[in-house]
Amino acid sequence: MKFFDYNKEDIRKTLSIAWPAMLESFFAAFAGLVDSLMVSSLGAYAVAAVGLTTQPKFIGLALFIAANVSISALVARRKGEGKREEANKIFATFLVFIIVAAIGMSILLVTLADPIIRLCGSEEATHDSAVLYFRIIMGGMIFNCIQMGINSAQRGAGNTKITMRTNLVSNTVNIVFNYLLIEGHFGFPALGIKGAALATVLGTVVSSIMSVASVWKKDNFVSIPLILEQKIKPCFDAFRNIIKVGYSVFAEQILLRVGFMATSLMAAAQGTQAMAAHQVGMNIMGLSFSFGDGLQATAVALIGYSLGANNPELAKKYGSICRFIGGCISVVLAGLYLVGGGWLYGMFFEEQAIVDIGIGIMRVIALIVVLQISQVIYMGCLRGAGDTLYTAIVSTISVTIMRTAGSFFFCYVMNWGIIGIWMGVVADQLSRLILGSVRFKKGKWMKIKI
């Protein structure tokens, strides 16, 4: 069935949820890019130092990302089933879990920051700055975990405009305090990389407050006043539901980060300039991912609702609409990256050697973005239906094996250096696209109960 055969109401409903979700994800990625741009004023070493913290940070967040996928899928399904009280029981259990887990994880990562960053391949020029940045970011991770968790529940309920506003304000706070604290403006101290970390934490503090406020309304599908009024308590059955959907996502996240860490180590081994160019490339690729991520969140909400309402064909239709929209966006982005790659890198670095490396990276990213957005949507559709074991297997094959092996082959065997590492990313994205699309089209995911 072609896109134009869908009725206007299905397309309108998809776009009404998709545009805030895409805008939210885009501005989060854009804030990361601006963060790198402002940090680049300190030198290539600072960009590389921040880049070294990315993978260990996400390993620390793996448990919470898995829980977020669970709560989003479960809330969407319960909304489709019309079971508001059960959804809030799951939400109450989820909140207690992430708060306790975030405190424990934060203490652990701050304590072990030095050996963790050394394990990530830091050099003398980047180690101390990376450790400082990592400690501050992970010290404030509880605020990040709270806002991510509540926003995931809101997305599952289809409230993407609420999460968009939360993240827009958070990212604005981050950028403003980056300006004030990195180099020191309007009487604020020039704190360098420490200022960048503090600005990020301040942004998450604001967003966590806004997120909590968003569920403090009785008419929301997930609502703290409702939980208190009806004396809904966390329970083991709800926790078991969260684990059932999320355990394979957690395994997937860990295996993903093993693959990402391996390629990050290879990039770090290419030297500070190559690592700096690589980090900016990752941030730029994050911009394209943001569109897929927004459409993925849309697919989770609509597919979960449709399956909960016992309408699997409508669920598949929504997934196809999201993928078509994503495909159109990816073609536009690929063209922009091909034409504007040198200009983008010129904003970050004065050193022509780094800009030249970046132009090569951007040519590869132009290919990656076409594969990436579609695979993210397909995989999001499967996760939203609860087919998380399959997505974990696909991620293991694609990222942990294909990406790592491909990066090693092109980087060292073919001697392509940092560009070879990005060819490994192409192999990863292509593998996930093929395996995700085949599973989606077969339709087995429509029969999964969660």
Model-inferred region functions:
Residues 21-29, 36, 65, 97-106, ...:
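Hydrophobic alpha-helical transmembrane segments in multi-pass membrane proteins
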Residues 21, 25, 36-37, 73, ...:
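Transmembrane alpha-helix boundary and packing residues in multipass membrane permease domains
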Residues 68, 72, 137-156, 163-171, ...:
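Short runs within selected transmembrane alpha-helices of multi-pass transporters and secretion channels
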Residues 16-35, 136, 170, 203-207, ...:
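Transmembrane helical elements of multi-pass membrane transporters/channels
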Residues 34, 70, 107, 111-115, ...:
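Transmembrane alpha-helix boundary/anchor motif
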Residues 47-107, 144-163, 275-341, 372-396:
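Small-residue-rich hydrophobic transmembrane alpha-helices
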Residues 30-48, 117-124, 180-191, 254-287, ...:
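Helix-terminus/linker motif at the lipid-water interface of multi-pass membrane proteins
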